[in-house]
Amino acid sequence: MYQAGVDFGTISLTPILHGVVATVLYFLVGAAVLVAGFLMVNLLTPGDLRRLVFIDRRPNAVVLAATMYVALAIVTIAAIYASSNQLAQGLIGVAVYGIVGVALQGVALVILEIAVPGRFREHIDAPALHPAVFATAVMLLAVAGVIAAALS
């Protein structure tokens, strides 16, 4: 009679632990980039963006903040994907590209404010959804796409 046996070999948790540490560190860098993006939008828009989004529930502020998060997430994901196999170098790259993404998103918002008729900033705290917020959202996503493509 034959006995069924399964050989699992040696199990090493080292690669898993390295992956967990890398995941946590990339999360922290990514979260810092998102916070920087939120602060940048808060600086460029009238009023307290946190209050406009989470307390007053102003739809234009919500769309702008949410789109900024998605746009910066696209840049951060692309930066992680293109990052070095060396963890420290990869984290530095993601942080640098993330800050560049925040800066370019800010530049795009300023250019949009200058280039289009009217003042979109005046509609951020409006209780009604303004159509210009969608044009602004698409522009932010387009900028994120260009940055992400440049990283690949």
Curated annotation (Swiss-Prot):
InterPro entries: DUF350. Keywords: Cell membrane, Membrane, Transmembrane, Transmembrane helix. One of its GO terms (cellular component) is plasma membrane. The chain crosses the membrane at residues 21-41, 62-82, 92-112, 131-151. It is found in: Cell membrane. The keyword Cell membrane applies. It is a multi-pass membrane protein. Belongs to the UPF0719 family. This is UPF0719 transmembrane protein Mb2631. It comes from Mycobacterium bovis (strain ATCC BAA-935 / AF2122/97).
